[in-house]
């Protein structure tokens, strides 16, 4: 082996990849109840400032219509006898280019103009949906009265700048109000978007050279081509700007960072007290507002096909909040049985002065906008006072826990079975909260490194595993778990540790954990608060059962487990277990009654009717009859209908007892039997 190769080999061994250089293990007290992972600093959006940019793209169409007329005029000019007699060599070329390119391109731009309009939601009081722009010889825009430099709408801090008339200003003000309920400030940015170069001097120069027929036609053709190229570019840029606005992106045609900085600087004096811009007012910060989509963009279409782009710049409160992810830490005993406090929300925001706190939705970090430093979120409906906090997760964070007797009252303590190895991802990348019920070996496996020397032994308990200075993609493996380490170009999060409360000790409030009997259920490996609610049992219910000596064994435990399964199933439908059991009982009783009724109808139909008829006949026989008045009736004898006749034809009957005639075809209908 050469000396150079030996030196390289020694250097490689000296810089060998070691797991201890990459993996950091930070033990945490396993009795603390919660781990509070810092997410970021947060501020609430209190209001919105609207910048309104009006684009009158009808001006472009006017230029296109005028160019169309000039092209037709030049085509007629080349076909005139005077021009033909001049015998210009470019005559055929000009006529061919007009027919094959110029006119077709103009018609295509007309179609593109209407396509841009069709993309945008029209105003209810604007043009009809089926109205289209067409080339004609008249001015497509009716003359409109322009308003002055200032035209106040509402209060002085809501005036609009620009060249629109009063009707448009009022309509835009109402439109901005409906697009965001927090709207209080509106400013229109002067329209400088559609700048069409004027060729008046060039046209006048051409008219002076009109006597030179061949030179005039060539120069006129070059001017038309240049104008068409410019209009084509304007339509392309405007189409991209509309598409970007519909996708909530700001196109440079609408607003550049420099222009946004100037407009925000001009209206800063009108920003309400205690509100400020989401970023410090510097030119370098304007890119963050535009590129990170902090500024929202809308586009609308007004009457006469005018387009307005509305930019919403949030105004934030000066109060800052620290956002934490609340992760429950199970306190485990024997046989995988653990107690855990289920938090009321996944995220908590605490003001920097600790006086207020808020509860955030589970998707708050994704729903909020991220600036270079802070999260921007819309304020929730309720902002709580810290001194009046009653729930366990916020009291532990604020060090408000006073006694262990209140744990059962203020905390949603649950008991369940957990996996012996739990690794819960935090901070997105290369950070895990671990809960281990036994000593565990963690092996680092990298593609170009030996795993024999990359073994980390972690004692049973709770802590944080953090990957630092990860220069390659590796895997951390135990006997049952695998964690992926990612190589990051930069740190997406500034990780900071929060000192946990040392005064709170969950084990002091759960001295009877080993005595609690729980139902046999699947082990938990997820520490999400919503998952824990359905996969564990309440401590208060277990203690009531234990105090009532309701400890079940064997078959009783299986029956209880079946009830628990039913309650767990209906719990997914947000139905109380008692209500569901009552409904099931009513359905069962109804089915039993229906079954008995069907058996009666099949086996002994008419039994009840016969019994009722007998009772009624006996009652009637005991009542004295009127001799001078008889009445016919029908009775059932031996399951057949019989006619009861006490006389006939209204004549007086000499029989004191009724006569019975059987309605039977086999008998002689003239035979009458007495009822003795």
Curated annotation (Swiss-Prot):
GO cellular component: host cell plasma membrane; membrane; viral envelope; virion membrane
Coiled coil location: 169-215
Lipid bilayer topology: Single-pass membrane protein
Cysteines engaged in disulfide bonds, as pairs: none
UniProt-annotated glycosylation sites, renumbered to this chain: 76, 87, 266, 469, 505, 548, 628
TM region positions: 577-597
Gene Ontology biological-process entries: fusion of virus membrane with host endosome membrane; symbiont entry into host cell
Subcellular location: Virion membrane; Host cell membrane
Pfam families assigned to the protein according to its UniProt record, in alphabetical order: Baculo_F
Name of the protein: Envelope fusion protein
Organism (species): Lymantria dispar multicapsid nuclear polyhedrosis virus
């Amino acid at each position: 082996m050469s000396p150079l190769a030996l030196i390289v080999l020694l250097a490689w061994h000296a810089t060998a990849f070691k797991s201890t250089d990459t993996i950091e293990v930070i033990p945490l007290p396993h009795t603390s109840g919660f781990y509070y992972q810092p997410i970021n600093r947060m501020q609430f959006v209190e209001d919105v400032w609207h910048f309104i940019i009006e684009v009158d793209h009808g001006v472009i169409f006017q230029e296109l219509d005028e160019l169309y007329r000039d092209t037709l005029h030049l085509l007629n000019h080349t076909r005139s006898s005077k021009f033909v007699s001049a015998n210009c060599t470019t005559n055929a070329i000009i006529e061919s280019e007009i027919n094959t390119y110029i006119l077709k391109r103009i018609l295509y731009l007309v179609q593109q103009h209407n396509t841009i309009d069709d993309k945008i939601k029209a105003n209810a009081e604007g043009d009809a949906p089926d109205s289209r722009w067409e080339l004609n010889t008249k001015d497509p825009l009716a003359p409109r009265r322009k308003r002055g430099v200032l035209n106040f709408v509402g209060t002085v801090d809501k005036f609009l700048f620009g060249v629109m008339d009063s009707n448009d200003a009022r309509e835009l003000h109402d439109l901005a109000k409906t697009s965001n309920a927090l709207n209080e400030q509106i400013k229109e940015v002067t329209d400088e978007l559609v700048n069409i170069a004027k060729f008046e001097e060039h046209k006048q120069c051409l008219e002076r050279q009109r006597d030179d027929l061949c030179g005039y036609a060539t120069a006129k053709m070059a001017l038309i081509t240049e104008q068409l190229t410019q209009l084509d570019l304007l339509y392309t840029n405007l189409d991209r700007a509309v598409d970007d606005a519909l996708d909530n992106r700001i196109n440079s045609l609408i607003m550049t960072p420099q222009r946004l900085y100037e407009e925000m600087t001009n209206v800063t004096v009108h920003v309400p007290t205690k509100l400020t811009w989401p970023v410090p007012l510097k030119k370098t910060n304007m890119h963050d507002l535009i590129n990170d989509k902090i500024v929202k963009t809308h586009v609308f279409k007004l009457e006469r096909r005018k387009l307005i782009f509305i930019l919403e710049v949030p105004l934030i409160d000066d109060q800052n909040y620290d956002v934490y992810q609340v992760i429950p830490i199970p306190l485990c005993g024997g046989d995988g049985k653990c107690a855990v406090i289920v938090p009321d929300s996944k995220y908590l925001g605490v003001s920097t002065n600790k006086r207020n706190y808020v509860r955030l939705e589970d998707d708050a970090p994704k729903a909020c906008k991220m600036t270079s430093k802070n999260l921007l979120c819309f304020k929730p409906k309720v902002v709580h006072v810290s001194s009046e906090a009653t729930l366990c997760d916020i009291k532990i964070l604020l060090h408000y826990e006073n006694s262990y007797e209140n744990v059962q009252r203020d905390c949603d303590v649950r008991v369940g079975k957990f996996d012996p190895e739990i690794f819960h991802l935090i901070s997105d990348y290369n950070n895990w909260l671990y809960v281990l019920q036994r000593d565990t070996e963690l092996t680092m496996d990298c593609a170009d490194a030996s795993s024999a020397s990359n073994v980390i032994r972690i004692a049973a308990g709770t802590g944080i595993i953090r990957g630092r200075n990860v220069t390659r993609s590796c895997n951390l493996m135990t006997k049952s778990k695998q964690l992926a380490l990612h190589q990051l170009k930069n740190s997406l999060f500034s990780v900071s540790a929060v000192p946990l409360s040392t005064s709170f000790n969950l084990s002091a409030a759960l001295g009877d954990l080993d005595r609690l009997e729980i139902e046999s259920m699947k082990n938990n490996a997820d520490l999400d608060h919503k998952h824990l609610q359905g996969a564990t049992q309440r401590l208060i219910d277990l203690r009531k059962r234990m105090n009532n000596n309701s400890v079940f064994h064997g078959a009783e435990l299986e029956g209880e487990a079946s009830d628990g399964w039913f309650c767990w199933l209906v719990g997914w439908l947000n139905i109380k277990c008692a209500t569901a059991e009552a409904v099931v009982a009513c359905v069962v009783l109804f089915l039993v009654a229906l079954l008995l009724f069907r058996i009666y109808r099949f086996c002994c139909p008419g039994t009840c009717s016969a019994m009722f008829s007998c009772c009624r006949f006996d009652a009637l026989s005991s009542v004295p009859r009127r001799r001078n008045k008889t009445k016919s009736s029908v009775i059932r004898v031996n399951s057949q209908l019989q006619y009861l006749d006490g006389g006939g034809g209204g004549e007086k009957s000499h029989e004191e007892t009724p006569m019975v005639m059987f309605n039977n075809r086999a008998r002689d209908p003239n035979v009458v039997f007495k009822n003795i």
